[in-house]
Regions:
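N-terminal export signals
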Residues: 6-20
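Extracytoplasmic "Venus flytrap"
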Residues: 28-45, 49, 53, 58-73, ...
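Short, solvent-exposed amphipathic alpha-helices that sit
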Residues: 38-52, 133-137, 161-181, 195, ...
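Short beta-strand elements in bilobed, periplasmic/extracellular small-molecule ligand-binding domains
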Residues: 53-62, 153, 177-189
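Hydrophobic alpha-helical segments within soluble ligand-binding/sensing domains
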Residues: 71, 126-151, 165, 195-197, ...
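Hydrophobic alpha-helical
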Residues: 79, 87-104, 170, 189-251
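Flexible loop/hinge segments that line or gate small-molecule binding clefts
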Residues: 93-132, 139-143, 150, 156, ...
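Hinge/cleft segment of the Venus flytrap/periplasmic-binding protein
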Residues: 158-162, 173-174, 267-319
């Protein structure tokens, strides 16, 4: 992705130079992590909005979404640079409260996207309906299982609102609607794909009769795919994943993944910038925007509307 990295660096430098100047609008966008495919897709939406709306964007975030200290530093840096507005996907719903309140008190409007923060004075909160998506994931996994069986959850990390809500939705739906299913393991991968493989392998070893796994994030999914393949359990242990990458799609095609829950991160990034653009121009965007997640099965993969989600044209252009 060298072409894209060059563009990112150039646009960030241009935006940085513009900060503090006259009436030039610079919107700072802070993802949870720059290393995940999900946020690469968010970035593409951010860039498209910047082009369409003729604003500059300063994109900066921690490499890993467990690094809330780095995200706090970035917020404070953007305050010091006097950006016009900030959009953020918070690594932790509590740790980011004070820095974002500092931004708001300094006159910088803030939009929250993907993962919430415990503040009230934000412009807009834009996210997938994560609790509902978790409920849907539970129903989807249950549909692949026959009779009473054990299931497990490979989870992201504590404190990340988006994934916590998915996990709560999954767990509550299993308990209420599928009493024949028992959740025998709930383990965090701490947003690390390598660690998620170890977690999933440990679960599979401890529960040889496991019927299914729900992996609540991109990292959790990638490790779970590897663990199931490594034990030759593709198709035997049903796996419902969240988010997408080339690995997810290949695993759905070969039967390792039974279903993918897919968001629309491009739209998420676009709307985050758009909400702040509207605010900076005296408009009032919706306080909350919920974007749906979709269930994708193997039979759906070649449908044009699904291809636009899992293999968007912009991705081909940047590889």
């Amino acid at each position: 992705m060298n072409t894209r990295r060059g563009f990112i660096a150039g646009s960030a430098l241009a935006a940085l130079t513009a900060c503090g100047r006259s009436n030039k609008k610079v919107i700072g966008v802070i993802p949870k992590a720059t290393s995940h495919m999900f946020f690469v897709s968010v970035h593409a939406g951010v860039d498209q909005a910047a082009k369409d709306l003729k604003v500059d964007v300063l994109w900066n975030g921690p490499q890993n979404e467990t690094d809330f200290a780095r995200q706090i530093e970035i917020v404070d840096s953007m305050i010091a640079q006097q950006v016009s507005a900030i959009a953020i996907s918070a690594t932790d719903e509590r740790a980011l409260v004070a820095p974002l309140e500092r931004a708001i008190k300094s006159g910088i409007p803030v939009t929250i996207f993907d993962s919430g923060v415990n503040i009230d004075d934000y412009v807009s909160f834009i996210a997938t309906g994560n609790f509902e998506a978790g409920c849907t994931a539970a129903r989807t996994l249950a549909g692949f299982l026959n009779g009473a069986t054990d299931v497990a959850m490979v989870m992201q990390k504590p404190g990340g609102t988006s994934t916590v809500l998915r996990e709560q939705g999954f767990e509550q739906t299993i308990a209420k609607e599928f009493p024949q299913l028992k959740i025998v393991a709930r383990q965090y991968c701490m947003a690390d794909a390598a660690r998620s493989r170890t977690v999933a392998e440990d679960i599979l070893a401890a529960h040889p009769n496991l019927g299914g796994i729900f992996a609540s994030s991109e990292a959790a999914s990638l490790g779970s795919i590897q663990a199931i393949r490594g034990r030759n359990l593709s198709g035997k242990v049903k796996l419902v994943t969240f988010d997408f990458s080339k690995t997810h799609v290949e695993a759905l095609r070969d039967g390792t993944v039974s279903a993918m829950m897919v968001q629309d991160p491009f739209h998420l990034g676009y709307e985050a910038v758009h909400s702040l653009y509207r605010t900076l121009n005296g408009e009032t965007p919706p306080k909350r925007q919920d974007l749906p997640a979709r269930v994708i099965l193997k039979a759906d993969l070649d449908k044009p509307e699904i291809q636009n989600l899992v293999q968007p044209k912009w991705l081909d252009e940047t590889h």
